[in-house]
């Protein structure tokens, strides 16, 4: 006879098996889908809502012992002078959507594009990052080792974010409130940049959100579709920085899981996304850029995600400063006013935007989709399939300008007017789940039987 204890164990096992069988897997986020019928937002500059300054402006500086006579390791990786034999980016207008750009001797003629924090013209930079990103795109050569990737390109600055400003609190979660302001400002700025004629739009200031946080991005999606399809602009965005660097508003971005071999129908593991990088996750309209070390390895801080398309140097950056003299800089003051090296996927995005300007100048017949395809197809050191850390691999300016690529198929090209939503993941087969739960049930049943036999033998041994 089976003991009461064994019967209780058997009941528990049955409950566990039933629970495992009945509980579905955790719900995954859906990829964002553009409503093709939605109108893009009004792009007019101006604050989305009243903002207040919460800190003094900071200027990037020179870390003691630095020598700018030679090109930085990051610049040596890309070797822009070799690319200039084929293109310098002439005739291309590149929009920089970030903390603003301060013109200077290495950044002359930057066009004002407007401000979405205050009522300036966008040529104010209180953080230093926007000016540095602009320098990587189109900084002018001099008698030192620095130059932007596409010195022939023109720049227009739109200030959309700053760590020195915050929205006046109206209650609720301040992180969500800031995200709403940033997402709204970004959508308007993308439309305005496209209307100004930008052929490349650089989004260096990004927003990171937990996947389960509900922030309406419908207007942003319409803005991205409008710029990428209707206006044929290449949109390049930073993938995001995990850890202290965080997103533009100061919120840290959490890196996502890598490929899940158990989901072959979802090779980029969209189902595993826990943190969203905005606007990078708006695929396939945005070229998202991860960061590399000077040794051509993924940076520890670069945010992984199924949207990452390519990678570029994002550490030990040397670029143009937002100081009064407009000289070079390689450091930014930390909370103790000590200079820390310039790092981040924002700078990597600046490099790739410069490459996009080179490609657009050399191949004016290519649409935005084909430009992105050329940049990703000629990247090197990537895996056989795109990686969630570095995408197709390290951007290669010379290869992007010189390689002969097969003609794009119909599926490679974006529609001219009506944009289809990104495809839903393929339906999952229930067979692996049936096998797994069936195995679990069999194992638990075997444990119950073994427990019953053991209990009976012990009882017989005592007789």
PLM regions with names:
Residues 160, 314-390:
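Hydrolase catalytic cores
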Residues 21, 25-91, 105-106:
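Protease zymogen maturation seam
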Residues 207-309, 316-349, 433:
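Substrate-binding/specificity loop regions of serine endopeptidase catalytic domains
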Residues 1-30, 437-456:
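Secretory targeting and sorting signals
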Residues 90-94, 151-156, 195-201, 229-235, ...:
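Loop/turn elements at helix/coil->beta-strand transitions in domains of secreted/extracellular proteins
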Residues 82-94, 99-112, 121-179, 285, ...:
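Subtilisin-like serine protease catalytic core
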Residues 57-67, 190-213, 238-239:
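Short acidic, glycine-rich surface-loop motifs adjacent to enzyme active sites
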Residues 363-461:
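C-terminal subdomain of the subtilisin-like protease fold in secreted/lumenal serine endopeptidases
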């Amino acid at each position: 006879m089976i003991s009461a204890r064994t019967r209780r164990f058997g009941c528990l096992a049955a409950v566990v098996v039933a629970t495992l069988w009945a509980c579905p897997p955790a719900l995954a986020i859906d990829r964002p889908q553009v409503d093709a019928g939605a109108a893009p937002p009004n792009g007019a500059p101006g604050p989305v809502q009243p903002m207040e300054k919460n800190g003094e402006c900071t200027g990037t500086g020179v870390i003691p012992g630095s020598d700018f006579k030679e090109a930085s390791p990051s610049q040596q990786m890309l070797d822009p002078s070799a690319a200039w034999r084929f293109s310098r980016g002439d005739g291309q207008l590149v929009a920089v959507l970030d903390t603003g750009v301060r013109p200077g001797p290495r950044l002359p003629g930057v066009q004002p594009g407007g401000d979405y924090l205050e009522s300036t013209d966008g040529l104010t930079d209180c953080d230093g990052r926007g000016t540095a990103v602009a320098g990587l795109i189109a900084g002018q050569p001099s008698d030192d080792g620095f130059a932007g990737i596409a010195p022939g390109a023109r720049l227009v600055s739109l200030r959309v974010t700053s760590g020195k400003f915050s929205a006046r609190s109206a209650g609720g979660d301040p992180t969500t409130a800031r995200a709403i302001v940033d997402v709204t400002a970004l959508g308007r700025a993308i439309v305005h940049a496209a209307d100004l004629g930008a052929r490349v739009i650089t989004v260096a200031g990004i927003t990171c959100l937990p996947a389960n946080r509900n922030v309406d991005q419908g207007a942003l999606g319409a803005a991205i579709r409008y710029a990428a399809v209707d206006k044929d602009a290449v949109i390049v965005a930073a993938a995001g920085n995990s850890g202290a660097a965080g997103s533009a508003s100061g919120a840290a971005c959490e890196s996502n899981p890598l490929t899940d071999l158990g989901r072959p129908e979802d090779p980029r593991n969209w189902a595993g996304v826990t943190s969203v990088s905005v606007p990078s996750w708006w695929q396939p309209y945005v070229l998202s850029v991860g960061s590399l070390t000077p040794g051509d390895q993924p940076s520890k801080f670069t945010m992984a995600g199924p949207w990452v398309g390519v990678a570029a140097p994002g550490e030990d950056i040397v670029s143009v400063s937002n100081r009064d003299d407009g000289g070079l800089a390689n450091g930014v003051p930390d909370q103790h006013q000590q200079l820390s090296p310039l790092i981040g996927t924002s700078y990597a995005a600046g490099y790739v935007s410069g490459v996009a300007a080179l490609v657009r100048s050399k191949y004016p017949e290519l649409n935005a989709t084909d430009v992105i395809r050329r940049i990703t197809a000629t990247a090197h050191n990537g895996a056989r399939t795109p990686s969630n850390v570095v995408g197709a691999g390290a951007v290669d300016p010379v290869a992007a300008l010189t390689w002969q690529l097969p003609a794009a198929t119909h599926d490679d090209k974006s529609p001219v007017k009506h944009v289809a939503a990104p495809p839903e993941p393929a339906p999952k087969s229930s067979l692996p789940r049936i096998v797994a739960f069936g195995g679990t049930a069999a194992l638990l049943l075997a444990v119950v039987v073994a427990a019953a036999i053991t209990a009976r033998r012990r009882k017989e041994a005592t007789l």
